[in-house]
Swiss-Prot record:
Keyword field: ATP-binding, Cytoplasm, Glycolysis, Kinase, Nucleotide-binding, Transferase
Species, as recorded: Acaryochloris marina (strain MBIC 11017)
EC number: 2.7.2.3
Name listed for the protein in its UniProt record: Phosphoglycerate kinase
Pfam families on file: PGK (PF00162)
Location relative to the cell: Cytoplasm
Pathway involvement of the protein, from the record: Carbohydrate degradation; glycolysis; pyruvate from D-glyceraldehyde 3-phosphate: step 2/5
Known partners and oligomeric status: Monomer.
Annotated PANTHER family: PHOSPHOGLYCERATE KINASE, PHOSPHOGLYCERATE KINASE 1, CHLOROPLASTIC-RELATED
Catalysed reaction equations from the record: (2R)-3-phosphoglycerate + ATP = (2R)-3-phospho-glyceroyl phosphate + ADP
Length: 401
């Protein structure tokens, strides 16, 4: 899907125009209401600065947390407005609501190149319900629309889909443009060999993506808690490891499908097991054929790491979604760390590496190699759905290029 982007709009299109920008400012705060990681705010700057430099009046909208349609004082966007003011080097006008007379007055007072931030759109139940009247009110203070919130693009909400019925043009910002470029290219026309590494605890949450990837990839590497469902399906003893009993047939089907399509499906040959689920548990490395009763697998083992590294060494494109083990516990982080370092190394030799949202992003940041990847997706659910080939409502609603 080729969409019109902010790059298609000139100063003549934008000067003096009121532009509603849907951003994703859902950043983590500490107990004192201080922002602990401003990555998402910084990620929106190229779009905001492009608009202000072309003389637009920028109206920023975002959700924050899950206030469930009620005003929640701890979920106001005030800290975001303060951080944005610092990063942009100009005062950002903060509104106390996202619709109504106060918003209209503050937006009306903006000069060309100035920025206003609306209050948390989820303080109104009409946002997540995609209520047409709420969408109309939200859009009423603007002339055109830019969506730069990839993380919510898989939801049809008022600020991601509803407003596009009232504002034209409706285009993608630079963040969404980059997401589409990397994620779609990886699926539609990748440099080969193409490998996908899928981790995480449950097969059930990744079924769609694994099935789609089996039609596209040359190699599929599986780690994380979901491996034990595959082992049990093969008839192996898995101790107290996590197993989805109702997905054993599915695991067999996926293995058969990989074989039929000529996809190299790699499961770990050894695992690090623990006597309980804790950071200080006793741990040992065992072959997958020798998992002891009463123990649970919490990471892939050193032999598996070597096998995975060998499989990735000649790949030209790699998509990674989901950790190899319980990387939050240092004792069970080695597999995830090793995969992160391997991807950083092959990126240096020209491979495209795409970190597909969620826990894998936290993992590469923890290891300190985030900067070395080709692309880090800002959307967890959205990137998975795009990789599954689903249509994202927030993207579909934008103007065609």
């Amino acid at each position: 899907m080729s969409k019109k982007t902010i790059a298609n709009l000139t100063s003549a299109d934008l000067s003096g125009k009121r532009v509603l920008v849907r951003a994703d400012f859902n950043v983590p705060l500490d107990g004192d209401g201080k922002i602990t990681d401003d990555t998402r705010i910084r990620a929106a700057l190229p779009t905001i600065q492009d608009l202000t430099s072309k003389g637009a009046k920028v109206i920023l909208a975002s959700h924050f947390g899950r206030p469930k349609g009620q005003v929640n004082e701890s979920m106001r966007l005030t800290p975001v407005a303060a951080r944005l003011s610092e990063l942009l080097g100009q005062a950002v006008t903060k509104c106390d609501d996202c619709i109504g007379d106060e918003v209209a007055a503050k937006v009306g007072a903006l000069q060309n190149g100035q920025v206003a931030l609306l209050e948390n759109v989820r303080f109104h139940s009409g946002e997540e319900a995609n209520d047409p009247e709420f969408a109309r009110q939200l859009a009423s203070v603007a002339d055109l629309y830019v969506n730069d919130a990839f993380g919510t693009a898989h939801r049809a909400h008022a600020s991601t889909e509803g407003v596009t019925h009232h504002l034209s043009p409706s285009v993608a910002g630079y963040l969404i443009e980059k997401e589409l470029k990397y994620l779609q290219a990886a699926i539609e026309g990748p440099q080969r060999p193409l490998a996908a590494i899928v981790g995480g605890s449950k097969v059930s949450s990744k079924i769609g993506v694994i099935e789609t990837l089996l039609d596209k990839v040359d190699k599929l590497l599986i780690g994380g808690g979901m491996i034990f469902t595959f082992y049990k399906a093969r008839g192996l003893a898995v101790g107290k490891s996590l197993v989805e009993e109702d997905k054993l047939d599915l695991a067999r089907t996926l293995e058969a499908k990989a074989k039929e399509k000529g996809v190299a499906l790699l499961l770990p040959s050894d695992v690090v097991v623990a006597d309980n689920f804790a950071a200080d548990a006793n741990a040992q490395t065992v072959s997958i054929n020798n998992i002891p009763d009463g123990w649970m697998g919490l990471d892939i083992g050193p032999n598996s790491v070597k096998e995975f590294q060998a499989a990735l060494s000649d790949c030209k494109t790699v998509i990674w979604n989901g950790p190899m083990g319980v990387f939050e516990f240092d004792k069970f982080a080695a597999g995830t760390d090793a995969v992160a370092h391997s991807l950083a190394a092959i990126t240096e030799t020209g491979a495209d590496t795409i970190i597909g949202g969620g826990d894998s992003v936290a993992a590469v940041e923890k290891v300190g190699v985030a900067e070395k990847m080709s692309h880090i997706s800002t959307g967890g659910g959205a990137s998975l759905e795009l990789l599954e080939g689903k249509v994202l409502p927030g993207i579909a609603a934008l103007d065609e290029a």
